[in-house]
Structure formats: structure tokens, C-alpha cells
């Protein structure tokens, strides 16, 4: 397609949101009008399914749950007065709590103001808050935030050691819907121990975000924590950023949360329009479907050309892959759906993997995210008439052109600035796109059975570890792995048994391995004191 035809295609498919100042360009995706026509019935059904979801239908049939994250920024559309009241009151409680912390009405036991936050959560309870913090937190926030988003002991120590000098003025937020998420529970216990060792009462620094009546809620209530905020069963972790999960940490950092909610609400209104060409989420869903033939055949590369949006690709990775990566469709047929997502930031990635994108396997489509405003204030000219921001813009446009010349498809999403309004809109845009695409390919985008399978396998391995230690404590002499596996009645799990014991031995945990490390089948195992 020549330059004139491309310009006409750009004009035909360009979307612009006047209140948000957001542009969406899908002209470099290679679909035609005939292809769009074939999808018209599927889009009509997807629009109807989305309307039913917002009206309170059971949109997560596997867990028999409603899906209500859209109600969070428009309580008036919640299906009951009770839900509407709960949403409004929770937002007010978040704002009141943050204001009291900022003004010292809620303060550390030893006086003064809280200076830091440790946020303990995993998955959606971490990725959204991390993305929003990096993109929107002021340079000097009222509280600095630190995240414990894994059960890695070394990683936990790094965060706690960094905060140690200010532990007495640190607020801790524990985020877990059930209260039983092992990684979050482990983080909570590690932090609690550090507070105890410092002579501090953990409860006087702790806040819970959890579901009503959960294990975590019971712990927080009985210990007298500072506050408990709700996690609703109709909000999934990966769509929870505009619930208490994301709004409380944001408010404590001084981020205007109502502006985020307003941006999301404006985008929700735009993406409710049941017309493909004037609905930005539908345009994105169409592009995804076209790129991967509705089967996820191509990866999604996300390149924000703005440092403050660097974590957006990680946030999208969970939102897209956990929602759409499904073995079966809604009728139980095996389909193996999904879209792989990766990315970092431009122009950094132009010096990393863009070489392969242009000249290697054509197994992807790319989303450029452009921000029009370079910075607050004027820029230095690095060449006559040219600024650093001009280079950033020029490199984006150049990469887009270079990829298109090699038959590589791309989408360009343009924001006027990175603000609470546009970040809220960005979150809402992709939440809706994932929902529409899920309906197009007929999968449940709101559950995650694969994650649960991994949790069950991990629990079984830890139970096996306890059994191994018990048997070894009764053995007077070293025994072989095969013998030990037979004694626990699991000869088929010899490899797992070896890997568990190797980890215990490396950490001095009551086990020693004798023999050549490169030949595990010849090792002898014994208990140590």
C-alpha cells in the first residue's frame, strides 16, 4: 500500500476521544472491510454479552460469580442499591483513611507521621499498584511505597532492610481476597516478625484489604489492626486496580484517585458503544483477532515510549494472559486459547529485540504507546531545532514504518499526557478489550484454573517434604533416594523427592546429601541435627 493509500486508511480507522485526548490508530493492522463484515455477528453478540455482564449477569460461570469491576467507577450502574452504597462508602473510607494518615490523625505509636508503606500482595494485588505508583506517584510522595510481591526470602530481606531505619513509621498493607494465598501470608509473617524483633506492635501498623469473613479479616479484627477494606467477590485480582486494592495505596501516595476513576468512567462510556468503528476497545479486539486469526497465533509486544509507563507491559501481561489463556471454551471444548504478551519500553527495546521483530520470525504484532507531552516545561535542544523528545517521537515513528515495510503489523495508542485521568482510561480500555475479545473467542475471561492447579501441586509437594523429614528422622543410617521414595510410598516421585531434599540441604534444613552431585541416583540421604 502506497503512502497516499495508507494516509486514507489512517483517516478511515482513526479513533479519537475528545474529553481524554486519546488517539487509537489501527491502520497498520492488515484487515479489510470484508474481514470486518464476517465478524459483525460475533461483535453484536459480544456487545450484548458485555451489556448483560454490566447489568449483573453471571459472567464467570465456572465460579458462579458476577463480574463487576465496571461498577467501581460508575456505582450508579450497579445492579442493586446495596452494591452501589457499598462502593460509594468504600471510596469515602479510603479517602478518609488516607487524609487521616497524611495529617497525623492516624500515626505511628511513637508519634510523628507515617513515612513509608510496605504493600504485601501478589499478582493483581501487586502489578496494578506497582504500575500506578511508577506512572503517577509524585516525586516527593507523602509516603514512599515498597512492594513484597513474592515469597523469595532474599527479596523480602532486601525490601525490609531498605525500610528498617524507618520501620517505626512504616504502614503495612496486606492484600489477599481469601487470606490464604501462601505468598502473601508468608510475606505478612516475615514482616510481622521484623516488627516484633524491633519491639514494635505490628497490629498498630497494619491494614488489611480482603473479603468479608476471610481468614485475613478474622486475624485483623482479632488483633485490632488499623483498618480493613473490602475485596469484593465480583472483582478479580487482575481487574482490581480501581478497587481498594489499588486505590488505597494510590491515595496514600498522594495520587488523585477520583481522577483515575473519572478517566476509567469516560473510557467505559466510550467502550459501551455497540459500534465497532467508534468503540476503541472493539477496534483493539478486532486487531487482536485479525493478528492471531482468533487463535492467538501471534504474540503481543507492548512498547510504551515513556519511562513512567514501563510497567504497563507487565500489568497487561497478567491481564491478557491470565484472562484469555484457557484450555477450554464456555462449552467445554478444548481450544487452547491465549495471547502471549511481552515488552519493556521504547527506545530501549530498539537496542534489544526489535532487530528480531523486523528481520526474524513474523510471529507478533506490536502496540506502540505514545505520549505527546515530552515533559513539564521547555526542553533543551540537543541539536539545532531538535530535543530529546523529538528523538523519542522520531524513533517511534521510524520503528513503526520500518516494521510495516517488512509486513509487521502494529497498533499505535497515543495519550496527551501521563495523568491520573489518562492512566485510569488506559486501564479501563484494556479491561474492556480483554472482555470483548474473551466473548469473541468464547472463553471465560474471569477465572484462572491453571493457577489453581499449580497451587495444588505446590501444596502436595510441601506435604511430601514434611513426610520425608519425618521418615529421615527415624533412620539411623544414610539411605538412598530410591529407598526413601519407596518408604514414603512414592517411587514415581523420586525426582521431586531429590529436588526437595537438595533445596533443604542447601539451606541447612536438617538434611545432608552424600555422594557425587552430578549423579543424583548415587546419593545417600541422612537427617542432621
UniProtKB/Swiss-Prot annotation:
Main location: cytoplasm
Record's catalysed reaction(s): alpha-D-glucose 6-phosphate = beta-D-fructose 6-phosphate
Active site: 322, 351, 455
Gene Ontology terms describing biological process: gluconeogenesis; glucose 6-phosphate metabolic process; glycolytic process
EC number of this enzyme: 5.3.1.9
Entry's Gene Ontology cellular component terms: cytosol
Origin superkingdom: Bacteria
Annotated keywords: Cytoplasm, Gluconeogenesis, Glycolysis, Isomerase
Statement: the UniProt record of this protein carries the keyword Ion transport: no
The protein's annotated pathway: Carbohydrate biosynthesis; gluconeogenesis; Carbohydrate degradation; glycolysis; D-glyceraldehyde 3-phosphate and glycerone phosphate from D-glucose: step 2/4
Subcellular location field: Cytoplasm
Gene Ontology MF annotations: carbohydrate derivative binding; glucose-6-phosphate isomerase activity; monosaccharide binding
Top EC group: isomerase
Disulfide bonds: none
Family: Belongs to the GPI family.
Role this protein plays: Catalyzes the reversible isomerization of glucose-6-phosphate to fructose-6-phosphate.
Name of the protein this chain belongs to: Glucose-6-phosphate isomerase
Organism: Cyanothece sp. (strain PCC 7425 / ATCC 29141)
Amino acid at each position: 500500500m502506497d503512502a497516499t493509500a495508507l494516509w486514507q486508511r489512517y483517516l478511515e480507522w482513526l479513533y479519537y476521544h475528545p474529553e481524554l485526548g486519546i488517539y487509537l490508530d489501527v491502520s497498520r493492522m492488515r484487515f479489510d472491510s470484508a474481514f470486518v463484515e464476517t465478524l459483525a455477528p460475533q461483535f453484536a453478540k459480544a456487545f450484548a454479552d458485555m451489556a448483560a455482564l454490566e447489568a449483573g449477569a453471571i459472567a464467570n460461570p465456572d465460579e458462579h460469580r458476577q463480574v463487576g469491576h465496571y461498577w467501581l467507577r460508575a456505582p450508579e450502574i450497579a445492579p442493586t442499591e446495596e452494591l452501589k452504597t457499598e462502593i460509594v462508602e468504600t471510596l469515602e473510607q479510603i479517602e478518609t483513611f488516607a487524609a487521616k494518615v497524611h495529617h497525623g490523625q492516624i500515626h505511628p505509636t511513637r508519634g510523628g507521621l507515617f513515612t513509608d508503606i510496605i504493600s504485601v500482595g501478589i499478582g493483581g494485588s501487586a502489578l496494578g499498584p506497582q504500575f500506578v505508583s511508577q506512572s503517577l506517584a509524585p516525586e516527593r510522595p507523602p509516603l514512599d511505597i515498597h512492594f513484597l510481591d513474592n515469597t523469595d526470602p532474599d527479596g523480602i530481606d532486601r525490601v525490609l532492610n531498605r525500610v528498617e531505619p524507618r520501620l517505626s513509621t512504616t504502614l503495612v498493607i496486606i492484600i489477599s481476597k481469601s487470606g490464604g494465598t501462601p505468598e502473601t501470608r508468608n510475606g505478612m509473617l516475615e514482616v510481622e516478625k521484623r516488627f516484633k524483633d524491633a519491639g514494635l506492635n505490628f497490629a498498630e501498623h497494619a491494614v488489611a484489604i480482603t473479603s468479608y469473613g476471610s481468614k485475613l479479616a478474622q486475624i485483623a479484627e482479632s488483633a485490632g489492626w488499623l483498618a480493613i477494606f473490602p475485596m469484593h467477590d465480583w472483582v478479580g485480582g487482575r481487574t482490581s486496580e480501581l478497587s481498594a486494592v489499588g486505590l488505597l495505596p494510590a491515595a496514600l501516595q498522594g495520587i488523585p484517585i477520583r481522577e483515575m476513576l473519572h478517566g476509567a468512567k469516560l473510557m467505559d462510556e466510550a467502550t459501551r458503544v455497540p459500534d465497532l468503528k467508534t468503540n476503541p476497545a472493539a477496534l483493539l479486539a478486532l486487531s487482536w483477532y485479525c493478528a492471531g486469526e482468533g487463535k492467538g497465533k501471534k504474540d503481543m509486544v507492548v512498547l510504551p515510549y515513556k519511562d513512567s509507563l514501563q510497567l504497563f507491559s507487565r500489568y497487561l501481561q497478567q491481564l491478557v494472559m491470565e484472562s484469555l489463556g484457557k484450555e477450554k471454551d464456555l462449552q467445554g471444548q478444548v481450544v487452547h486459547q491465549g495471547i502471549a504478551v511481552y515488552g519493556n519500553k521504547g527506545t530501549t527495546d530498539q537496542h534489544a529485540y526489535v532487530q528480531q521483530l523486523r528481520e526474524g520470525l513474523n510471529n507478533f504484532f506490536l502496540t506502540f504507546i505514545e505520549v505527546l507531552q515530552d515533559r513539564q516545561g521547555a526542553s533543551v535542544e540537543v541539536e539545532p531545532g531538535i530535543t530529546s523528545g523529538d528523538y523519542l517521537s522520531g524513533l517511534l515513528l521510524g520503528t513503526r514504518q520500518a516494521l510495516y515495510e517488512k509486513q509487521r503489523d502494529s497498533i499505535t495508542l497515543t495519550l496527551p499526557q501521563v495523568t491520573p485521568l489518562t492512566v485510569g482510561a488506559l486501564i479501563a480500555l484494556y479491561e474492556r478489550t480483554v472482555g470483548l475479545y474473551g466473548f469473541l473467542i468464547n472463553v471465560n475471561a474471569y477465572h484462572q484454573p491453571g493457577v489453581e492447579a499449580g497451587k495444588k501441586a505446590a501444596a502436595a509437594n510441601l506435604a511430601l517434604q514434611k513426610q520425608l523429614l519425618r521418615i529421615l528422622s527415624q533412620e539411623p543410617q544414610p539411605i538412598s533416594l530410591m529407598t526413601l521414595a519407596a518408604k514414603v510410598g512414592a517411587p514415581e516421585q523420586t525426582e521431586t523427592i531429590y529436588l526437595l531434599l537438595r533445596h533443604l540441604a542447601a539451606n541447612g534444613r536438617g538434611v545432608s546429601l552424600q555422594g557425587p552431585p552430578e549423579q543424583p541416583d548415587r546419593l545417600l540421604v541422612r537427617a542432621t541435627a
